[in-house]
Amino acid sequence: MALGNKIDNSSNRVYCLLGDGELEEGQVWEAAMCASHYKLDNLLAIVDFNSLQIDGNITDVMNPTPIDEKFKAFGWNVLTVDGHDIDALLDCYEEAKNFKGAPTVIIARTIKGKGVSFMENQAGWHGAAPNKEQVELALKEIEEAL
């Protein structure tokens, strides 16, 4: 999509959200190399970097780190941010929009389940649904944090 927009001289931007566990897949790096080769500065990838995937910690499954250095080696503009800081994320979006000549990746360091005591940093919640009582507790904890 980003390449098509570039060819069509479109001002549209493409946003791609990735999980850190996804970065263990080869096709992600093929796409990263292609995006850099074609200087797709209309492409912004955001990596949700919480170090957890369905099978556990990413470094125990198939360690994709250091993510920032890998993207730099592939020719990307790399920004790192606290993924829970909305103002900092918005600043990164603006910086990415103004960066020319290469795609940008924002590595958003996050905590899986942040703000919910029984979910925080727990890989088991990756593909699980809370029951009714857990939903009520989670909503209560989130509302209290606001």
Descriptions of predicted regions:
Residues 1-146:
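Glycine-rich ThDP/TPP pyrophosphate-binding loop and its adjacent helix/strand module
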